[in-house]
Structures are given as structure tokens and as C-alpha cells.
């Protein structure tokens, strides 16, 4: 059975946030031999996820402050970064019926996102809400640079949501870690948490923490953050994103 958010796993959002960690530590680009061109996005991801997990709103000022901490390489499209940073909000508002799509679009508009990024955000909301089901079945993957959200979904669909082959191929194409995290999330939403390359297999369980890139977080703290986000999703009302959301 497809593991959509409409039928929550016993592990809640833990596999999803662990997927983000795994993608950032993927072999050949992970700590300690990370290419200098990789954007330092985990700190911004944690800052925003913590705010939403606590029930706080994230308006334009707070969003921009987090975004400004990430220095993207000159040739890297900012759209995947924006989608990844918005992922905690998308998760806690996920619905297979798309009940909150308009609200998230209003939030994106309040941030001044471009029209193309707003379209990508809406597609991403649908993909997450439907458990990664949205995509072009039967399409063949390519190796586009930079990859679009549809390219990510085409890869996931072509490999039937198998996480390890998906990440391996995306890495072979030199997709940046922020894109690996997105494609990994879409794959695990489609196939379920059983396909996650668990951090223990990558040696992450043997570290005291995930290093300064992850603000000294441990995997246990990542799990706690995932549980807090899952609690917001399971609650009676979604987390506010500010006035644009509440309207």
C-alpha cells in the first residue's frame, strides 16, 4: 500500500526528517569531504522547522532572515532550496484532498515568491499530500541540470519510489544535496519508510552529533523535532503562517 500522509506511519515524520539528514550526508558529498560549492542549508531548515513545530508563524521577515543564512552557489537554482525549507510547513498542512493549498499559496505570495516558484510549491503540496503519487507514470528519467520538481518526480516514478536507487542515480548526476533531500522525500513518501537508508548504515549513529552544519543536533533531537511537527499535523488546527495564512 502506498504510504501517503492520509494513512500515517507508526513512526510519524521521523523517516522524513531522517531522509533529509541522510541526503545531506550522502557518500561523496557528505561530511567531512563535502564540496565547497554545497549550500549550507541545514541550519536554515532547522530554524524554520523549529518555529513551525512550536506553533509559531513564519512571515516574510522571519523567512528572509533564514534564507539569507544560506549562500547558494552562483549556478544553483534557488527553487529547490525554497521547497525544502518550506517542507515542514507543507508536512503539517498535508492533506490528500488539498484542503490547505490556497492558504499555502497565500503564504508564498506574502513572501514574494516568483510565479514559477508558487506553481512549483503548489505541485509540491499536492505531491506530499498524495504520498508522492503525482507524477508522469512511464516517463524515462534524464539527467537535467538544474533539475525541476517535475524532473524529480519523473525520477521517483520511473524507479517506483525505490529510495536507494533514486538517491544513487541523482547523486551520480551531481544533483546538489538540497535536491537529493527533495527527491529522497518524494521517494519515501511513495514507497514508505522501509526503503530509507537508515543513518546507522552511514555511520551517523556512531557520532555524538551531526556536526556544526546541523548545529550540533543529534539524531535523537531530529526525531524529537519530527515528533513535534507530526503533533502539529495531527492536531485540530494547522500551524499558522501569519496573516496571509489566517485569512
Which role fits each region the language model picked out?
Residues 1-247:
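Structured, active/binding-site neighborhoods that engage oxygen-rich ligands
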Amino acid at each position: 500500500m502506498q504510504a501517503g500522509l492520509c494513512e500515517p506511519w507508526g513512526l510519524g515524520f521521523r523517516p522524513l526528517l531522517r531522509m533529509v539528514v541522510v541526503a545531506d550526508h550522502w557518500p561523496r558529498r557528505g561530511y567531512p569531504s563535502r564540496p565547497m560549492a554545497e549550500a549550507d542549508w541545514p541550519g536554515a531548515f532547522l530554524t524554520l522547522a523549529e518555529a513551525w513545530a512550536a506553533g509559531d508563524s513564519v512571515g516574510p521577515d522571519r523567512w528572509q532572515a533564514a534564507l539569507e543564512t544560506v549562500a547558494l552557489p552562483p549556478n544553483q537554482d534557488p527553487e529547490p532550496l525554497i521547497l525544502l525549507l518550506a517542507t515542514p510547513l507543507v508536512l503539517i498542512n498535508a492533506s490528500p484532498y488539498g484542503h490547505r493549498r490556497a492558504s499555502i499559496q497565500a503564504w508564498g505570495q506574502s513572501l514574494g515568491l516568483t510565479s514559477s516558484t508558487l506553481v512549483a510549491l503548489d505541485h509540491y503540496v499536492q505531491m506530499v499530500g498524495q504520498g508522492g503519487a503525482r507524477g508522469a507514470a512511464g516517463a524515462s528519467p534524464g539527467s537535467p541540470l538544474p533539475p525541476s520538481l517535475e524532473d524529480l518526480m519523473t525520477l521517483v516514478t520511473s524507479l517506483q519510489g525505490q529510495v536507494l536507487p533514486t538517491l544513487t542515480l541523482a547523486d551520480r548526476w551531481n544533483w546538489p544535496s538540497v535536491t537529493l533531500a527533495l527527491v529522497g522525500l518524494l521517494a519515501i513518501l511513495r514507497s514508505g519508510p522501509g526503503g530509507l537508508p537508515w543513518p546507522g548504515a552511514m555511520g551517523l549513529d556512531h557520532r555524538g552529533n551531526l556536526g556544526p552544519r546541523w548545529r550540533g543536533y543529534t539524531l535523537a533531537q531530529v526525531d524529537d523535532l519530527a515528533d513535534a511537527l507530526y503533533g502539529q499535523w495531527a492536531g485540530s488546527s494547522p500551524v499558522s503562517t501569519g496573516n496571509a495564512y489566517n485569512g
